[in-house]
From Swiss-Prot:
A motif (Microbody targeting signal) lies at residues 500-502. This is Peroxisomal catalase. GO terms for biological process: hydrogen peroxide catabolic process; response to hydrogen peroxide. It is found in: Peroxisome matrix. Pfam families: Catalase, Catalase-rel. The keyword Ribonucleoprotein does not apply. The keyword Heme applies. It comes from Toxoplasma gondii. It catalyses: 2 H2O2 = O2 + 2 H2O. It is an enzyme of class 1 (oxidoreductase). It comes from the Eukaryota.
Length: 502
């Protein structure tokens, strides 16, 4: 199957009915006792209509609540079978159907698309080995490297528990006390933090993963999706204008482009690292606050992602889409990245809360191309897939034709783990300041650095003085000019950047 089949639904008939299919004679007036009397409880159509309306909303995503999506396909253009045995990569020209969802992170479902925020970049590949979910962002790094910090970080991006307002003190207090965040903070406060819609941004898996080839050789890998529309960003003035003029700017732009057959596409590339390199590499390769410089591990092209079909119904496909980093096919495995390990639990857990135990039965989440036997996943609220009929719900058994284990799907077993069970800080002889300093000096042009300073200053100047002083010291450690320019922009003396004298 080369594309996701559209969801079938019963077309409207000529007569309005209740949810039970009974014809409705009057949809404009309730049944009452006389023309001015009270409504009658036995008016089933009224009760049916109100009761369902009361239950229309489901819990919104705790992060990535606002977004848009589309269907499409992934086509292999280059051979990477020397690295990975996953069947979706098995031959050049092979196409795999895909669903994509793009989003902001911190905003509620009604928030503006152009606010300063990372953008979610999530893909569901419907392969014959089951669904592979690539659940990333438009940034190659993240704010924290251990999932235990994630709830605290997200709380700072949401609303103050007393005022219910967004609070710059919360944001910068956390950033200034968690220096590992500075790489992502620097990226976010460039104009890359306000991309011009979803079509003009890159996507990244961010984490380190593993590829396994047919000979059971393992490699570390990172994913990159490079936009073929070209990178375009909004400056802070234009982003603010669009917040009021067109808060749904990015969702609208994606939908309209596909409707006009201007299909957006991305080139999928990978970085590959031999396992032995990780032992001596200058940075911890499992640290999601770091990148692998392309000079050390260049991009290798793999294929092309194309989005060519809008959803028929937003709630059906986009709102109910459930992505999970734990959804991997044979040949793709997790690494020891702590942030990834936490996400592998949290995403599936929140789907069960938000959509129910049988979220995997929702059409957009089904593994359409896989012929599987998930014999043990039974019952539960809203089970609507036939519940496996009369087939047994235990294994092993002696029934002919019952699904068997696939040893090809076994994990590689290439990781040796030993050590004392304890809370271990991620100690590594590297720096949280070197890469953001290099990004500031060598990646950004002077106009981009000027925009970065202005974007930071506009927000940081709203925080307390002690928080400002902590933060500019962090910027100074990345690059002295960086720290001093931010200090001047928010009205601090440049001496506030310097380490305290002993």
């Amino acid at each position: 199957m080369t594309q996701v089949p559209p969801v079938t639904f019963q077309q409207y008939g000529p007569v309005i009915t209740t949810s039970a299919g009974n014809p409705v004679d009057d949809n404009q007036n309730s049944v009452t006792a006389g023309p001015y009397g009270p409504a009658i409880l036995s008016n089933f159509h009224l009760i049916d209509k109100l009761a369902h309306f009361d239950r229309e909303r489901i819990p919104e995503r705790v992060v990535h609540a606002k977004g848009g999506g589309a269907f499409g396909y992934f086509e292999v253009t280059h051979d990477i079978t020397r690295f990975c045995k996953a069947k979706l990569f098995e031959k050049i020209g092979k196409r795999t159907p895909v669903f994509a969802r793009f989003s902001t992170v911190a905003g509620e479902s009604g928030s503006a698309d152009t606010r300063r925020d990372p953008r979610g970049f999530a893909l569901k590949f419907y392969t014959e080995e089951g669904n592979w979910d690539m659940v990333g962002n438009n940034t190659p790094i993240f704010f924290v490297r251990d999932a235990i910090k994630f709830p605290d970080f997200i709380h700072t991006q949401k609303r103050h528990p007393q005022t219910h307002l967004h609070d710059p003190n919360m944001v910068w207090d956390f950033f200034s006390l968690v220096p590992e965040s500075v790489h992502q903070v620097t990226f976010l406060y460039t104009d890359r933090g306000t991309p011009d819609g979803f079509r003009h941004m890159n996507g990244y898996g961010s984490h380190t993963f593993k590829f396994i080839n047919k000979d059971n050789e393992a490699f570390y890998v990172k994913w990159h999706f490079k936009t073929n529309q070209g990178i375009k960003n909004l400056n802070r003035q234009r982003a603010k204008e669009l917040e009021s003029e067109d808060p749904d700017y990015a969702v609208r732009d994606l939908f309209n482009a596909i409707a006009k057959r201007e299909f957006p596409s991305w080139t999928f590339c990978i970085q590959v690292m031999p396992l032995k390199d990780a032992e001596t590499y200058k940075w911890n390769v499992f640290d999601v606050t770091k990148v692998w410089p392309h000079g050390d591990y260049p991009l290798i092209p793999v294929g092309k992602l194309v989005l060519d079909r809008n959803p028929e119904n937003y709630f059906q496909d986009v709102e109910q889409a459930a992505f999970a980093p734990a959804h991997m096919v044979p040949g793709i495995e997790p690494s020891e990245d702590r942030m990834l390990q936490g996400r592998m639990f949290s995403y599936i857990d929140t789907h069960r809360h938000r959509l129910g135990a049988n979220y995997h039965q929702i059409p957009v989440n089904r593994p359409w191309n896989a012929r599987g036997g998930d014999y043990s996943v039974r019952d539960g609220p809203m089970c609507v897939d036939g519940n496996k009929g009369s087939q047994l719900n235990y294994e092993p058994n002696s029934v002919d034709g019952f699904p068997k284990e696939d040893r090809n799907a076994a994990v590689s077993g290439t990781t040796t783990v030993s050590g004392t069970v304890a809370c271990h800080p991620q100690e590594h002889p590297n720096s949280d300041f070197e890469q953001p300093g290099n990004f500031y000096r060598t990646v950004l042009s002077e106009p981009e650095r000027e925009a970065l300073i202005g974007n930071i200053a506009e927000h940081l100047r709203q925080a307390r003085r002690d928080i400002q002083e902590r933060q500019v010291k962090i910027f100074y450690k990345c690059d002295p000019e960086y720290g001093e320019r931010v200090a001047r922009a928010i009205g601090l003396p440049t001496a506030a950047c310097y380490p305290a004298k002993m």
